[in-house]
Amino acid sequence: MPRIAEARAGAEPSSPRQRARRQSILKVAADAAASTGLERVQMQEVAKSAGVAIATLYRYFPSKTHLFTALMADQIEGFAARVPERPAGTSPEDAVFETLGSATRNLLRRPALATAMIQSANAARASTVPDLARIDSGFLDLLLRAWGVQEATDHHITRLRLLILLWYGVLQSRLNERLTPQEADADLRLACHLLLAPGPDAG
């Protein structure tokens, strides 16, 4: 019988050994979801393949929702670290579009894993899954950097939040094959220009 998701946050690793153990769990979980999809990932098998006790896995990740939300947060942080500076001559809204397009292509390399992470993040509650806040803040910081905004106002944050919600919908439609790559790019580009281009209500 599968373990019922617990309404508590996972423990944070406090030593290099614990951090390595946590990363091993995340890598095994990512490979498993990429191969079988979220529903068929078994926590017992993840623990066994990662070489940890099942109690250790549940200490860090009380449920699959915690596990794959953490994985998405790590992936966004890793992606942000690899994004180059905006090329000269690129408009801010085009730079944000390129960043979102690159994130989309990166996630679609392993569509079953992308679906697992999105489903988990959508099911997570912010009060018990702290990594949800890491996803939100990581994505906002990434797009603010691409946009070239150093001192964000509430209006900046609101526009980016709307754009991120739209991006999730476009990504889900790509995963469901409801949009072609060309349609997805066109929708994202239009959204970036409508929401981010300079105008009388900018700032």
At which residue positions do the language-model features occur?
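C-terminal peripheral helix-coil segments that are non-catalytic and often amphipathic
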Residues: M1-R8, L140-G148, N176-G203
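Basic, helix-initiating cap at the start of DNA-binding domains
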Residues: M1-T36, R40-S49, H66-T69
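Short hydrophobic clusters on alpha-helical segments that form packing/core surfaces
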Residues: I25-A33, Q75, A103, W167
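Alpha-helical DNA-contacting segments of helix-turn-helix folds
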Residues: A33, F68-Q75, M117, A121
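Short hydrophobic/aromatic patch on the recognition helix
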Residues: G51-F61
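Hydrophobic alpha-helical connector segments
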Residues: A70, P84-R109
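Short linear capping/connector segments at secondary-structure termini
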Residues: P84-E85, A116-A124
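Amphipathic alpha-helical packing segments from all-alpha helical-bundle domains
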Residues: A124-Y168, D185-H193
